A protein has these predicted regions:
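Conserved alpha-helix/loop element of class I SAM-dependent methyltransferases that forms part
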Residues: 19-35
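Conserved class I S-adenosyl-L-methionine
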Residues: 37-45
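Class I SAM-dependent methyltransferase SAM/SAH-binding core
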Residues: 46, 52-99
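A short acidic, Gly/Pro-enriched loop at the edge of an enzyme's catalytic core
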Residues: 97-110
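A short SAM/SAH-binding and catalytic strip from SAM-dependent methyltransferases
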Residues: 109-121
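A short glycine-rich, Lys/Arg-flanked "PGG" loop and its adjoining helix->strand segment in the class I
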Residues: 124-136
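Conserved beta-strand signature within the Rossmann-like core of class I S-adenosyl-L-methionine
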Residues: 137-144
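Core SAM-dependent methyltransferase catalytic element
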Residues: 173-184
Length: 184
């Protein structure tokens, strides 16, 4: 699933601790993720949010991080190993046209789609595939950079999510990001 995918080497910059100044994973994720949850993270890069997700779900939870770039997945695995989170973080390589998460049908409690939907070839199929993984009542946090996704494009993503059975539960104020919380 790739339209204009972030280059693999940019993953190192996106995983920088300095990024916490604008995108604090704990602050963003803590209201939505609890111990024991199963979380799906499409487009995790090298795991900036994945590591915090792994800490939040705890030893009884699971994070499935899916990316189309092998080097991103390799970097994520290294970082998860260093953080001692490989027991709960699974990094998968996606196909160009599918996340490859059919085995998660109806099993996911929360999806983090942070800065990724604008990179997929079509939002509709992406949201359909993601929606199929969600349990009834489960949530998806959609966040897109204002510098890459204008208001009209973001609304188009929300409409595509709606057609996939996801309802907007609220808009979130996240600085440089356009964001909404959706629910199945």
């Amino acid at each position: 699933m790739a339209k204009h995918v972030c280059p693999w080497w940019f993953g190192y910059l996106m995983a920088s601790p300095l990024r916490r100044l604008t995108d604090d994973p704990a602050k963003i994720l803590t209201p939505h993720v609890r111990a024991g949850m199963t979380v799906l993270e499409p487009g995790p890069g090298m795991g900036f949010f994945t590591l915090e997700l792994g800490r939040l779900v705890g030893p009884s939870g699971r994070v499935v991080a899916v990316d189309v770039q092998p080097r991103m997945i390799e970097g994520l695995k290294r970082r998860a190993a260093r953080a001692g989170l490989l027991d709960r973080v699974e990094a998968r390589l996606a196909a160009p046209d599918s996340l490859g998460v059919g085995d998660l049908a109806g099993a996911v409690d929360f999806v983090l789609a942070y800065g990724v939907v604008h990179e997929v070839p079509a939002a509709g199929p992406f949201f359909i595939e993601v929606s199929q993984t969600l349990k009834p009542g489960a949530s998806l946090l959609l966040a897109e950079p204002k510098s890459r996704v204008n208001v009209v494009e973001f609304e188009g993503e929300l409409q595509a999510a709606g057609r996939a059975g996801l309802q907007v539960r609220g808009r979130l104020s996240m600085g440089r990001m356009r964001a909404a919380l959706l629910q199945k």
